[in-house]
Amino acid sequence: MARPEEGPELRLARLWWALGWALVVFITVSCLEPPRYVPNLHLWDKAEHALAFGGLALWFGGLVRRSRYLVVAFVMLLFGGGIEIAQGVMRLGRDMDIMDFLADGVGISIALTALYLGLGAWASWVERLIWPSREPS
């Protein structure tokens, strides 16, 4: 069991964090490169923002202790705001849009709710599926 001041005890913590940061890089590149290079998912743009930022918040929320969920949400909001500002100043065919930022916030809020309702242990659950406890029953 993890100590209260630490995140969940994860065997694959480095892998989970590395995959999370790969997702951050992917979302950053997808949001900042010219639109002609980005695949069209044929979803509503605001839904894409909510899914991307909510997914990131849920991902990283599963890697930290419960008391850090609000920090994860705040960092994700800063990330979303930074992306919108960068889109506005880069002039590569992207526009700064407050509605995209609000959609990011909706996704993050949904993820935060899911984390508090119990999905925050998702990484531990996956690891238990991969490596079941060898303790005698």
Residue map of PLM features:
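Bulky hydrophobic segments
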Residues: M1-F101, G105, S109-S137
